[in-house]
Swiss-Prot record:
Subcellular location, record wording: Mitochondrion inner membrane
Impact after mutating V66E: In MTDPS6; uncertain significance
Record's protein name: Mitochondrial inner membrane protein Mpv17
Domain of life of the organism encoding this protein: Eukaryota
One GO CC term, this protein: cytoplasm
Source species: Homo sapiens (Human)
Higher taxonomy: Eukaryota, Metazoa, Chordata, Craniata, Vertebrata
Residue ranges of the TM segments: 18-38, 53-73, 94-114, 131-151
Length: 176
C-alpha cells in the first residue's frame, strides 16, 4: 500500500509526467511478456531494443495521446452517469480506437525500419484483426473505466489492463 500511496502523491504532484511514465513502463512490460511468454524467446534472445521501442512509444505516443484523449472526452461529455459512460465508450471505440490503431501499427513499423510499402502491406494485413480483437476487450473495460474511475486515474487503469493488450499489440506489430 505504501507504493500505491507514493504513486498517488506523485500523480497529484506531476500528473502528466506520471501518466506518461506509467504508460511507457507498462508498454515495456507488455513487450517483455510478449517476448518471454508468448514468443518464448528466453533471456538470451530477448530483443532489448524492441522493448525500449515499446517503452518509448508508451512515453512518447501512447501516454500523451491516450491521456490527452481522455481529457478531451471528459470536456466533450462531462459527467459520470451510466449514459455518459456509454457515450464516452461509443466515441472511444467508434472513433478513437480505429484511428489510434491505424497510427500505432505503422509507427511501430516505421521505428522497426519497414519501408513505406512494407509498412502499408503490414497495416493492411494486421489492422482488421487488431481492431476486431480490440472490440473483444476494450468496450467493457472502457465502460467501467468511464463510469467508475476518476479522470486522473483512467490512463493508469487502462494501462494496467493494457499490459495484456500491449503484449498482443507488441506481438502483432513485430510479427513479420
Amino acid at each position: 500500500m505504501a507504493l500505491w500511496r507514493a504513486y498517488q502523491r506523485a500523480l497529484a504532484a506531476h500528473p502528466w509526467k506520471v501518466q506518461v511514465l506509467t504508460a511507457g513502463s507498462l508498454m515495456g512490460l507488455g513487450d517483455i511478456i510478449s517476448q518471454q511468454l508468448v514468443e518464448r524467446r528466453g533471456l538470451q534472445e530477448h530483443q532489448r531494443g524492441r522493448t525500449l521501442t515499446m517503452v518509448s512509444l508508451g512515453c512518447g505516443f501512447v501516454g500523451p495521446v491516450v491521456g490527452g484523449w481522455y481529457k478531451v472526452l471528459d470536456r466533450f461529455i462531462p459527467g459520470t452517469t451510466k449514459v455518459d459512460a456509454l457515450k464516452k465508450m461509443l466515441l472511444d471505440q467508434g472513433g478513437f480506437a480505429p484511428c489510434f490503431l491505424g497510427c500505432f501499427l505503422p509507427l511501430v513499423g516505421a521505428l522497426n525500419g519497414l519501408s513505406a510499402q512494407d509498412n502499408w502491406a503490414k497495416l493492411q494485413r494486421d489492422y482488421p484483426d487488431a481492431l476486431i480483437t480490440n472490440y473483444y476487450l476494450w468496450p467493457a473495460v472502457q465502460l467501467a473505466n468511464f463510469y467508475l474511475v476518476p479522470l486522473h486515474y483512467r490512463l493508469a487503469v487502462v494501462q494496467c489492463v493494457a499490459v495484456i493488450w500491449n503484449s498482443y499489440l507488441s506481438w502483432k506489430a513485430h510479427r513479420l
